[in-house]
Swiss-Prot record:
Binds 2 Zn(2+) ions per monomer. Residues 1-48 form the J domain. NCBIfam families: DnaJ_bact, PRK10767.1. Zn(2+) 2 binds at C147, C150, C169, C172. The lineage of its organism: Bacteria, Pseudomonadati, Pseudomonadota, Alphaproteobacteria, Hyphomicrobiales. This is Chaperone protein DnaJ. Belongs to the DnaJ family.
């Protein structure tokens, strides 16, 4: 396995007095143990190696902690590819083309916006294909050349004692090509960083924590590779009056002690901007719940609508006249 090969290559017993090999050996073990975590394996499968760089996809302080060193990504990808059965092919194709990284954008909306839906305009700083070299990374009029060290494979094999170890080509860094005359705008990367404006459709009934995927709106690929995706992570701000449970809404409405005892009506505002009148029967108790059918949240991509549940709270008067006190004492 890739782990065993790398572990044997950098084992301290095989490399006495070699501090660099000892450091690599520790990193190999750390990477292997880290990637046994199902959550982190899922993150790598979704976001690639970018999920473990700079604290993850905008999350801050996440997967990136403790992973340093310029050559660590090669070790990391070797081990992860072996664990997932996919080798090192993720995001990279022939000719040095690499898929662009996926991006994450956090968006907060109000409960009213989640109720009605909206089209939001967002600005996203991202990498786009260089318009000078059309993504090739080479100066116009020139072409990348096949790497002479690895013959275009991006990998080389080296003897290590009794073993033959495959590693990333040191000349082309796994791309399989070299660019003798790089583009002056993108410096051979095939992409540049700009800020783009995008429209995001937020459907009515969207729930807190929903993820919206915009295919191909992530970072541009390297040297003509496909673009990554943009993921919009939505959070719905808590409402000052309503609480949400799926498609149903809940609220508490205070009524006077007189209304509770003798009956009456009150109006309650709803998210559609209207008011609904609720009839209170005589002898209504604290905690009594009324249901307004169809006054809750719309069900996502459906014609169904949830209900609004109103819980009664009874206001106890704090200041009573002598006459009011006498009347209450008669109960």
């Amino acid at each position: 396995s890739a782990f065993r090969k790398l572990a044997m290559q950098f084992h301290p017993d095989k490399n006495p007095d070699d501090s660099n090999a000892e450091r690599k050996f520790k990193e190999i073990n750390e990477a292997y143990e880290t990637l046994k975590d199902p959550q982190k394996r899922a993150a790598y499968d979704r976001y690639g190696h970018a999920a473990f760089e700079h604290g993850g996809m905008g999350g801050g302080g996440g997967f990136g902690a403790g992973f340093g060193g310029g050559g660590f990504s090669d070790i990391f990808e070797d081990i992860f590819g072996e664990m997932m059965g996919g080798g090192r092919a993720r995001g990279r194709s022939s000719g040095g083309r690499e898929r662009g990284a996926d991006l994450r954008y956090n968006m907060e909306i109000s409960l009213e916006e989640a109720f009605s839906g909206k089209t939001a305009q967002i600005r996203v700083p991202t990498s786009i294909t260089c318009d000078v070299c059309s993504g090739s990374g080479a100066k116009p009029g020139t072409q990348p050349k096949t790497c002479g060290t690895c013959q275009g494979s991006g990998r080389v094999r080296a003897a290590q004692g009794f073993f033959s170890v495959e590693r990333t080509c040191p000349t082309c860094h796994g791309r399989g090509q070299i660019i003798p005359d790089p583009c002056t705008k993108c410096h051979g990367q095939g992409r540049v960083t700009e800020e783009r404006s995008l429209s995001v459709n937020i459907p009515a009934g969207i729930e807190d924590g929903t993820r919206i995927r915009l295919q191909g709106e992530g970072e541009a690929g390297l040297r003509g590779g496909p673009s990554g995706d943009l993921y919009i992570f939505l959070s719905v701000k808590p409402h000052e009056f309503f609480q949400r449970d799926g498609a149903d809404l809940y609220c508490a409405v205070p009524i006077s002690m007189t209304t509770a005892a003798l009956g009456g009506t009150f109006d309650v505002a709803t998210l559609d901007g209207t008011k609904s009148r609720v009839s209170v029967p005589e002898g209504t108790q604290v905690g009594k719940q009324f249901r307004l059918k169809g006054k809750g949240m719309p069900v996502l991509r459906s014609s169904q609508v949830g209900d609004l549940y109103i819980q009664i709270q009874i206001e106890t008067p704090q200041k009573l006249t002598k006459r009011q006190r006498e009347l209450l004492q008669e109960f």
